[in-house]
Each structure stands twice: as C-alpha cells, then as structure tokens.
Amino acid sequence: SGKKVAVVGSGPSGITCAGELARNGFDVTVFEAFFTGGGVLVYGIPEFRLPKAVVKREIDGLEDMGVKFEYNSVVGNMATAEELFEQGFDAIYVATGAGLPKFLNVPGENLPNVFFANEYLTRVNLMKANKFPEYDTPTKHGKNVVVFGGGNVAMDAVRTAKRLGAEHAIIAYRRTEDEMPCRRAELHHAKAEGVEVLP
C-alpha cells in the first residue's frame, strides 16, 4: 500500500494488528516499552501456561514478514504522536494494554510483602525474579500466600506462588466458586496443585 503505520505496544492487540497490516502491504513499525515483544503474553502469563518460545516464534514470524520492532521505546517519551507523524507515519495504532493494577482501597494494601498480581507476575515472568540471586530482581517466596480475586490472573499468581515454594496457597474470592470469572480448567489445575479456595 505504500503507507507507514506505527503500532504502539506489542501485546496481543498490537501484534495482531501488525500482522494484518503487513499481510496487506503496509510498512509497520512496532514500538514496545519493554525490552522484548509480546506484552502480557510474556510478562503476565506464566511459562507453564504459555511458553515464551511460542510468543518468540510469533514475533520472529512478524519480523520475517518485514515488521520492525523498536524495543525500550516509550511513545510519549521517545516521540509524541505528532513527532511520529512528522517522521512519515500515516497512522498510529495504540495497543498499550491494561497494565495498571486495580486498587481495592482497603487497609494494608500498601504494606511490605503485598504485591499486585501484575507486578508479581512481571517480576517472575519477565525479570526472572524466580532465579534470584542469579538475577537481581528479588521477590518474596512466602510459605503462606493469599491471593485475592477469582479471575485467570489470580489463578496465574497463586499457581506461580506454588511453584516458587508456597506450602499453603489460598484463593480468596468475595462470591461463590461458581461465580469466579476464571476458566474452569484454571480453577481445576489450581486445586490439583494444592490451592485452597475460600469463596
């Protein structure tokens, strides 16, 4: 098409858009804030659920199609939208994801050893905190862990804690087990791994 498109973010939405655009003849550059591509597929979903090699294969396939990736590039800091247009981009697709935690506004949520799932999973999945001190990204490896929530992210966090040595891991959810929004398979796996559920 001869058109240049900037894709901001390399998570599921960003790489899907980049692939479709490349297949249709667009010149695509993906700007990613992290040092690797994949977004939540890499930093949020644990290796035991989605191997990083699968995501890398997808990114490599996009590069083979001509998609360019600019890592460690925070749009807004390294360039504004206006500056990207000045650099010759005809369009910008914003796929920045939802990486911010949802605060509960309850007493104690800012205490030491209280982590939001996205920070905890990012430390383990992307920054190799599970290999401390080999990698200098520590995270607590508690023997007793409580995860509040009933979605897939909560299941990922509690199952990761079990793999990091938690002897007693609990999922605490405000409604009934049947009302948990997680996939039934995720709940089944968590229970099979010894996670206790407190609805």
What are the language-model segments listed below?
Residues 1-199:
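Residues forming the flavin
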